[in-house]
Amino acid sequence: METEAIDGYITCDNELSPEREHSNMAIDLTSSTPNGQHASPSHMTSTNSVKLEMQSDEECDRKPLSREDEIRGHDEGSSLEEPLIESSEVADNRKVQELQGEGGIRLPNGKLKCDVCGMVCIGPNVLMVHKRSHTGERPFHCNQCGASFTQKGNLLRHIKLHSGEKPFKCPFCSYACRRRDALTGHLRTHSVGKPHKCNYCGRSYKQRSSLEEHKERCHNYLQNVSMEAAGQVMSHHVPPMEDCKEQEPIMDNNISLVPFERPAVIEKLTGNMGKRKSSTPQKFVGEKLMRFSYPDIHFDMNLTYEKEAELMQSHMMDQAINNAITYLGAEALHPLMQHPPSTIAEVAPVISSAYSQVYHPNRIERPISRETADSHENNMDGPISLIRPKSRPQEREASPSNSCLDSTDSESSHDDHQSYQGHPALNPKRKQSPAYMKEDVKALDTTKAPKGSLKDIYKVFNGEGEQIRAFKCEHCRVLFLDHVMYTIHMGCHGYRDPLECNICGYRSQDRYEFSSHIVRGEHTFH
């Protein structure tokens, strides 16, 4: 009771007079004794004085404040609040300035943005490390080799290289490594299951990288991607087919690609042993799809067909080589392993042996060159003559192609095409005898050798001035540096007529038209 009175007194009057201080001290000292009894006779007097003081304090508290005191108190309160608000704004501005000084901008979501490249970082430490990539600062250096790093963790990992420490060890084998992620990848090799599975062939792998490598070799996956790409191309590109109605009346107006079927003109050649095989090289698009005439059908090959096109081209090349070997004979490839013959007389036995394997008595003759070939249009059943009368030195002409060299001769006439059908037939009995072959070779040697050898007529030199071998097509007057290309080219000439395409049966008027037909691939089947 007395203590509360003293507190109230102190709050009401900020300053105490000496008399009141003395009275209070007297009250504290004489108020009570250790046994709880009042020892001073003046206790009642002091108690009354304390009560009076308490009443005076209560009256002082109950007095209403004046208008000036309220205004003064309001001003004091506002003056206390304003410094707090100002201090928070200053702190925020200071943080922004610090972040901008570090090269970062505070975003609304609390993250920091690099002012150089715009990279968003989650904190100031990450931003500080990132800024080192722009400034080139590397504060962490290796004491042994001098290597520097932007982060301390990279330095600690580097130090393990010098010490040879490998703290991460496999619990299943003796494998140990310096990095935790390397151990995590190694532990997958011990797992029983293979979580990464190919949806196209069913094979499973433990690592995703192995699955990605497998997809590059998976045929089902590549085929599916190719079919999807082809479907998209065909859905966006529907070629007009009005021009194809004249040549292909069977085709639908909305179909630009049809499954490949063997043409009837080639199907008829399968029963004849001496003629070329029916599997002639064609222009394929995709798998078992054939493209018809170039001017009539428009088709944009997608890039996904690249691998399949390469495989198909190699398959077509094998077919062409096989057809040419059947056409010329297996011994026609011998010049690849032998030195080129010096004279035409030495070439004749090779050609004779090659054509003796494919000749048939019921065929018309096959002209080989202007000195060694002749035909007859009336006698279709006579055997073939390998030697041509020298009085009729005619040969076919053709324009240069992309795969061979062109000669300087540019003569061409329609009479050359008729010269193969205007000579009388020779004696069939004499042609079939072996003695006749030898006599023809000798006649060719005596008539052609004085004019000079083949090397004297055609000489081909490389960039270094060295003479190289060349193979000439007598029908097209074209030189080939590669014997395989020469063999393939010879397989394109027709069996009955050199100017007849052996793929589609098209008959050309001269060698220029024949070469253009072969190069453009305008093979149309009716």
Swiss-Prot record:
The modification N6-acetyllysine is found at residue 288. The keyword tRNA-binding does not apply. InterPro entries: Ikaros_C2H2-ZF, Znf_C2H2_sf, Znf_C2H2_type. Keywords: Acetylation, Activator, DNA-binding, Hearing, Isopeptide bond, Metal-binding, Nucleus, Phosphoprotein, Repeat, Transcription, Transcription regulation, Ubl conjugation, Zinc, Zinc-finger. One of its GO terms (molecular function) is DNA-binding transcription factor activity. Changing residue 145 to F: Found in patients with autosomal dominant hearing loss; uncertain significance; affects transcriptional regulation as shown in a luciferase reporter assay. SUPFAM superfamilies: beta-beta-alpha zinc fingers. Gene3D superfamilies: Classic Zinc Finger (3.30.160.60). The modification Phosphoserine is found at residues 56, 78-79. One of its GO terms (biological process) is regulation of transcription by RNA polymerase II. Residues 28-91, 370-435 are annotated as: Disordered. Residues 29-50 have a biased composition (Polar residues). The keyword Metal-binding applies. A zinc finger (C2H2-type) spans 112-134, 140-162, 168-190, 196-219, 471-493, 499-523. It is found in: Nucleus. There is a cross-link at residues 95, 442, 448 (Glycyl lysine isopeptide (Lys-Gly) (interchain with G-Cter in SUMO2)). Residues 60-77, 370-379 have a biased composition (Basic and acidic residues). GO terms for cellular component: nucleus. Its main location: nucleus. Can form homodimers. Interacts with IKZF4 and IKZF5. Transcriptional regulator required for outer hair cells (OHC) maturation and, consequently, for hearing. Belongs to the Ikaros C2H2-type zinc-finger protein family. This is Zinc finger protein Helios. It comes from Homo sapiens.
